[in-house]
């Protein structure tokens, strides 16, 4: 199907598919830039819907109040945004693998945990271990069946303050650390 991957790179589309697969996501609202959230409580984080929109990472802002969001809107280039509840995470982890047969067969050998020593960094170190969480793997497999994706991918998650797991995104490509699998 022409354009399917491009459509699934949209944060609203892929997070809706993730929820259908049984994965949890941070609460969100899709808004026109300048529109205040109707259901979210602060703090929130602003994200572009796709990396091809706006100023991509420069449009990401953590806002602790309505006043901070209004100020952030003055800098944001994207016409439409995904506003998400900002979760003070314990950490992030991801997996790299591949799916074939329109997402019916998924291979994920390793999980990578980012080692964060500072709140304002993604982590300078990573640890790799076998991916053994069967419950999470089943949900990921369902997500890939929903996407019908064939190819290499990286899928990212965040661990919340009470160890809850939130889906963040899929990159439909190899990541920079994929050498660890080979």
Which residue ranges define each predicted feature?
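Active-site nucleotide/adenylate-binding loops and adjacent lid/helix of ATP-dependent enzymes
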Residues: 5-82, 87-89, 99-103, 126, ...
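A short, glycine/Asx- and small/polar-enriched loop/turn
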Residues: 38-42, 160-166
